[in-house]
């Protein structure tokens, strides 16, 4: 049906389907500043202004917007240098988001700026609480909101016509930079009416002047106040991200996921799905090569087992892949998924990491193509094993006056980047497979995908635009092969973008761990021995299993070595088993295994100090590794200088 939309003062005649969202239509018109974050308006990445009020474009049908004035980030401002065309430049809100460093990944920035614009038009002199309330509908995974709040306070002062103290390195002072001399001390800006009472309410100052050292004077950027180089385009909502891309003949991919935690596909019938008009391809494990690989974006050789397949006959978690579909529209692809008929042999799942290695436990990886790494043993559901002994732990415990033992549990956590996993694949004019993807590891992706796709490296090119947050979740090869297989099958461009629900069951998370600590202590608070055992649940696949869990002990257990003779000769033990279960796979996450060690260790140290009536900080400092001392695990693992 035909509808008319008024967007940023321009009239658009659009041909839509009744179920088309306003988000879909705006992006099809090239308004890429409107982002997809989820289907329910929770992230607020799809925030626009309708008749001056913030709304979620993803929650509105296009037909509902007819007769209303729509404003997107593209209407606010533009680069001040537009050739011969006069330009008013960036909007004050865009400028201050750049100047204050409020932009990190930038995926949420258009929504935040639009929400702030509505607030300042309604309340020119807002309180910090009012600003936080206005921004609360646009989730930001990166900044913690301190800088966006500072930016809006500063913009409010500028828009009221009040003078504001310059921020060195801001867009207003480029070029050149205005910096202090060596003789001047750094000056921190006090709270003022220019930007609200920031220091007293957020316990942070606006921005310090930067003192450039003599070493920094000879350098172009290091030691000098430099704004984020790509902040201007992010503040304008320019097409900087993977899905901000147009190409003719684009197909849309969807994945059929397993509803069983552990099962074997006995039969799969795709005839009805293939016959559906608009379906270009349906792929199952019967249609593509069976190549074992690891999804971990790590250096070669990958320090972990090869235990993944693009598509497999065995399902190992709820959400595992059953089939891929490519169709002319996302709606047709979704309908095709419903037409695929699958018969399963349901197997007993392993859902408790403590039971995974018990005799007789169901074996999750019994495929002959499995490739071991180090001490992995798939028949025992063991993805990795770590055994590190430093000194003589038994002797250390024998010399202790007290022994403290406790068990802790660290839960599974999802990265929750606002931009979901998304990829576009197509053949270029040189018959190279172009993979445009939201990844943290473009070169690892290229290397890992080559054998999976049956292509030499030179025939694959990976393009990494800006990513809308990753936090380790995109250090994994999770979606690239889906679109690539479908492009190979159809010879057409393919877009695959995960739903927010898929992010939680088919993506990755922090490794949940059960951690047992045993510590020997003398009456004066000296540690004599420290022992950690970690049982790590890697889920259905072992990507990052060894390296993440290795960090758990490597970083935490080296922090407190003991005092006196124990300082030079600590007694430390770190053992870990990383087990397969039928949970969704774990993977890389910011901190990379370290929080799973530090959190229980610090709880444990606090408990010991309390029991011995010692000052918790003094107790820690007495036993802590000090500057200049050798890291005991680095010695054990032959890392660093001798």
Feature map (PLM): residue ranges:
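Short Pro/Gly-enriched beta-strand edge/turn motifs at strand-loop
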Residues: 27-31, 296-297, 398-413, 496-503
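Beta-strand segments within the central parallel beta-sheet cores of soluble alpha/beta enzyme folds
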Residues: 38-41, 129-136, 285, 458-465, ...
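Gly/Pro-rich active-site capping loops and adjacent beta-alpha segments
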Residues: 62-106, 332-358, 383-386, 406, ...
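Alpha-helical support elements that line or immediately flank enzyme active sites
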Residues: 112, 121, 255-286, 323-344, ...
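Glycine-rich and small/hydrophobic secondary-structure elements
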Residues: 149-153, 184-206, 303-333, 471-521, ...
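Flexible, low-hydrophobicity surface segments
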Residues: 159-378, 403
């Amino acid at each position: 049906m035909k509808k008319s939309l008024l967007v940023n003062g321009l009239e658009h005649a659009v041909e839509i389907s009744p179920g088309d969202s306003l988000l879909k239509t705006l992006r099809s018109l090239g308004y890429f500043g409107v982002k997809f974050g989820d289907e329910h308006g929770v992230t607020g990445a799809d925030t626009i202004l309708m008749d001056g009020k913030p709304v979620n474009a993803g929650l509105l049908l296009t037909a509902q917007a007819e007769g209303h004035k729509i404003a997107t980030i593209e209407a606010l401002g533009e680069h001040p240098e537009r050739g011969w065309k006069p330009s008013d430049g960036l909007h004050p809100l865009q400028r201050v988001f750049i100047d204050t460093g409020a932009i990190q990944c930038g995926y949420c920035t258009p929504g935040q700026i639009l929400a702030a614009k509505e607030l300042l038009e309604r309340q020119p002199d807002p309180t910090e609480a009012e600003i936080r309330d206005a921004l609360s509908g646009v989730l930001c995974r990166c900044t913690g909101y301190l800088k966006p709040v500072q930016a809006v306070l500063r913009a409010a002062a500028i828009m009221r016509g009040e003078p504001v103290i310059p921020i060195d390195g801001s867009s207003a002072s480029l070029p050149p930079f205005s910096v202090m001399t060596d003789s001047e001390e750094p000056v921190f800006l006090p709270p003022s009416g220019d930007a609200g009472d920031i220091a007293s309410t957020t316990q942070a100052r606006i921005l310090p002047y930067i003192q450039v050292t003599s070493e920094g004077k000879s350098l172009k950027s290091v030691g000098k106040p430099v704004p984020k180089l790509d902040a201007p385009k992010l503040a304008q909502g320019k097409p900087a991200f993977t899905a901000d891309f147009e190409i003719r003949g684009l197909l849309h991919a969807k994945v059929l996921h397993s509803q069983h935690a552990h099962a074997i596909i006995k039969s799969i019938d795709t005839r009805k799905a293939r016959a559906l008009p608009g379906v270009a391809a349906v792929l199952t494990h019967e249609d593509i090569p069976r190549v074992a690989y690891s999804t971990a974006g790590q250096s070669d050789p990958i320090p972990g087992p090869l235990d993944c397949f693009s598509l497999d006959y065995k399902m190992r978690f709820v959400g595992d892949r059953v089939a891929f579909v490519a169709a002319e529209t996302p709606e047709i692809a979704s309908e095709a998924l419903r037409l695929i008929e699958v018969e399963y042999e349901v197997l007993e799942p392993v859902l408790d990491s403590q039971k995974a290695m018990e005799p007789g436990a169901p074996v999750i990886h019994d495929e002959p193509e499995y490739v071991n790494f180090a001490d992995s043993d798939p028949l025992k559901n063991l993805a990795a094993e770590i055994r590190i002994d430093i000194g003589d732990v038994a002797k250390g415990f024998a010399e202790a006056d007290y022994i403290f033992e406790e068990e802790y549990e660290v839960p599974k956590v999802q990265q929750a980047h606002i931009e979901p996993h998304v990829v576009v694949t197509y053949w270029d004019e040189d018959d190279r497979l172009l993979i445009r993807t939201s990844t943290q590891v473009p070169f690892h992706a290229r290397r890992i995908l080559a054998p999976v796709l049956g292509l030499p490296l030179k025939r694959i090119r990976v393009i990494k635009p800006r990513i809308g947050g990753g936090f380790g979740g995109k250090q994994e090869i999770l979606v690239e092969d889906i679109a690539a297989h479908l492009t190979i099958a159809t010879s057409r461009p393919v877009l695959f973008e995960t739903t927010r629900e898929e992010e939680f069951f088919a993506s990755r998370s922090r490794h949940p761990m059960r951690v047992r600590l045993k510590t020997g202590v003398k009456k004066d608070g000296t540690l004599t021995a420290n022992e950690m055992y970690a049982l790590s649940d890697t889920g259905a696949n072992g990507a990052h299993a060894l390296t993440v869990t290795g960090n758990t002990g490597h970083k935490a257990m080296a922090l407190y070595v003991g005092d006196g003779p124990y300082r030079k000769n600590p007694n430390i033990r770190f053992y870990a088993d990383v087990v397969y279960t039928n949970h969704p796979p774990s993977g890389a996450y910011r901190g990379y295994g370290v929080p799973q060690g530090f959190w229980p260790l610090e709880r444990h140290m606090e408990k010991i100090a309390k029991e011995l009536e010692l000052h918790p900080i003094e107790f820690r400092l007495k036993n802590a590794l000090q500057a200049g001392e050798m890291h005991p695990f680095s010695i054990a693992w032959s890392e660093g200088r001798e």
